[in-house]
């Protein structure tokens, strides 16, 4: 499963800039729909297009590894099959 670190990146940016950052602001700056951002934040494993990931990396000035990580699950169907 893919895990997004969007909440953490928002918190870091809020701390650095000493102001509140809303989903609406991120949506406006990135062009990503508010509903999509909400799903990324609130629904673990939500699938989104790579263009959105690119826009978020640009907005937060971060590498992809800071935005997403892969979390192995015991019943992970996306894991490669053994020979």
Where are these regions (language model features)?
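Alpha-helical DNA-recognition elements
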Residues: 39, 43, 55, 73
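Short, charged recognition helix plus adjacent turn
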Residues: 68-83
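Helix-turn-helix/winged-helix DNA-binding modules
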Residues: 18, 45-48, 59
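DNA major-groove recognition helix of helix-turn-helix/homeodomain DNA-binding modules
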Residues: 51-66
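A short, Lys/Arg-rich alpha-helix, primarily the initiator
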Residues: 1-25
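Recognition helix of helix-turn-helix/homeodomain-like DNA-binding domains
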Residues: 31-48
């Amino acid at each position: 499963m893919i895990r997004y670190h969007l909440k953490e990146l928002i918190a870091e940016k809020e701390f650095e800039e000493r102001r509140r950052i809303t989903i609406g602001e991120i949506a406006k700056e990135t062009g990503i729909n508010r509903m999509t951002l909400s799903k990324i934040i609130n629904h673990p494993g939500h699938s989104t297009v790579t263009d959105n990931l690119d826009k978020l990396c640009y907005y937060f000035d971060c590498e992809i590894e800071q935005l997403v990580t892969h979390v192995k699950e015991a019943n992970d169907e996306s894991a490669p099959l053994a020979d």
